[in-house]
Structures are given as structure tokens and as C-alpha cells.
Amino acid sequence: MARSKCCVRCCKVSDYTLQSLPIRKQMEKIPSFTIDHERLLRGIYVSRRDQVGGEEVTPFDIRMKEPNREPALHQGAIHTIEHLAATYLRNDAEWRDRVIYWGPMGCLTGCYLLLRGHLESRDIVDLMRRTFRFVADFEGEIPGAAPRDCGNYLLHDLPMARWEARKYVEEVLDCITEAQLAY
């Protein structure tokens, strides 16, 4: 049986390595991997600026944990924060039309927020304060935490999400410094 060229599952792992890719020499580090994570503080950072269809988009790094220096967020907690924050942001009267995306970082040390427009970190401190207070004070059913609505609806931890959100508000957002607003 011939192997399909598009199906990694049927190929040996050794068939696909970065060394064997013809574009290897052209690959550069992506901007987020050039940030010194050994010095990065919890805070709100402009990750970069993107142009999409003639419009500027500002991706923010909402850093809730100091990378490699404190435990990462628990999967259930960050998943619940994702659901609650995304719901809050898309319902915020002032910002909902600018929200493109809210979601967790793969490293589980924070989230990404993509907003339309040329924005600075300081511009969204109040929005983040309100968002995380909403999460910290939330009671009831988690929006979208049902089999029909979510790909992993059982992976939620509301008490831990509330605890992490409160900690972020009290220790970061309520006393944020300039060092926590720029890489």
C-alpha cells in the first residue's frame, strides 16, 4: 500500500524532521520567541502589530504567570478563564466591536487578546481589570460549557479560574507598572 503524501499518521516520524524540510534555511524565529522569557513579568504587553486587509490589529500578551519561574495555569482554570473572558469581552459595550480573538497561550502562562486598531498596553488596563474581576466574581454555569458548545466541556475548573483571576487583579492589574506594560 502506497503512503499518502498528506497524511503524517501513516509515515514514519523520521520521515518528517526540520532538518529534512527544504525551507529550513529560510525559517526565522517568530517574534514571540525573541522575547526574553527569563525576565518577563506578569503584565499586559503589545505582542506585535499586524496589518489585515488595510486595518491594523494589535495582538496583546496578557501574561498571568512569570514564565519558568512560577507554576503554569492549570488547564481547567485557563479553559474556564477563556470561556468567561471571551464571553465578557464580546459583550462589553465599549470594546466588543474591536475584539477579534481571546484565547490561552499554549505554554499556559497567559492569554492572547487581538483587538482592531492601533493600541497600547495602557489603553486596555481598565478593560482587563473589568474582565478579570468578572471572572473572579463569576457564579453559575460557565457559558459554553456543554457538549454541543465546547470541544472539551468537562475540562473546567471555576474555583481555580476565580482564584487565578483574583490574584491577577490584585497582584498585577490594580498596581501595574510601566515595566509590566512593555517588553
Feature map (PLM): residue ranges:
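Cysteine-centered motifs
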Residues: 6-11
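His/Glu-rich zincin catalytic helix
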Residues: 20-77, 81-89
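M16/MPP (pitrilysin/insulinase) zinc-metallopeptidase core fold and M16-derived inactive scaffolds
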Residues: 67, 71-123
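Active-site-adjacent, His/Asp/Glu-enriched structural segments that form or flank metal-binding
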Residues: 103-174
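Low-complexity, highly charged intrinsically disordered N-terminal segments
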Residues: 172-183
